[in-house]
Design a protein with these regions (language model features):
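Structural beta-alpha unit
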Residues: 1-4, 78-110, 117, 147-150
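Intrinsically disordered or low-complexity boundary/linker segments at protein termini
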Residues: 1-21, 109, 133-150
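Glycine-rich, Arg-bearing micro-motifs that act as flexible, cationic patches
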Residues: 109-133, 148-149
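Short, hinge-like loop/turn segments at secondary-structure boundaries
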Residues: 54-58, 104-105, 128-130
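Short secondary-structure boundary segments
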Residues: 41, 113-115, 143-144
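A short acidic, glycine-rich active-site loop
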Residues: 57-71
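Small/aliphatic-rich secondary-structure junction motif
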Residues: 2-55
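General small-molecule cofactor/ligand-binding pocket signal
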Residues: 38-40, 86-90, 140
Length: 150
């Protein structure tokens, strides 16, 4: 068991091209600290009003999104050299699910990506900000990419 304060690390990824960079940072930190690392991706669906036939295609699309997300998360874990690491895909509100999983798994540190913001994008409530304020543990925001001016 690790003597460091971080024994369980939750890596939260959006499965964009930045996920590998964030994953490497979390993987290296976990290895250095002797901590467990778990990967999480949350699929957030746009609510659909039930209107007969339109509901069934929406449900099939959601199921397909979950299947693809699981495949991509499994591939990311393998690319990081962590094929045996626990990884899960949840559906729902990203902030709520990240906080719920962190509590449920008694995580000591959440690692996620943070993008530089400019212009109007500064006013939007971003996931890393909301997780930071609601998390039951420390949060490490890994700086990635650059947001488009705007």
């Amino acid at each position: 068991m690790s003597t460091y304060p971080y024994r369980r690390i939750l890596l939260v990824v959006d499965l964009t091209e930045d996920s590998l960079q964030i994953g490497r940072r979390a993987r290296d930190l976990a290895a250095t600290l002797g901590a467990e690392l778990e990967l999480l991706h949350v699929v957030e669906f746009v609510p659909v009003e039930p209107m007969g036939e339109t509901l069934m295609p929406a449900v099939r699309i959601e199921d397909e999104l979950l299947v693809r997300a699981r495949q991509r998360l499994t591939a990311l874990a393998a690319e990081l050299g962590l094929p045996g690491a626990p990884h899960r895909v949840e559906s729902g509100n990203v902030k709520a699910e990240v906080v719920r999983v962190a509590r449920e798994r008694q995580v000591d540190l959440i690692v996620l990506g943070s993008r530089e913001r400019h212009g109007l994008s500064i006013l939007v409530n971003f996931t890393e900000d909301t997780v930071l304020h609601a998390a039951p543990c420390d949060v490490l925001a890994v700086r990635v990419g650059k947001a488009a001016p705007g």
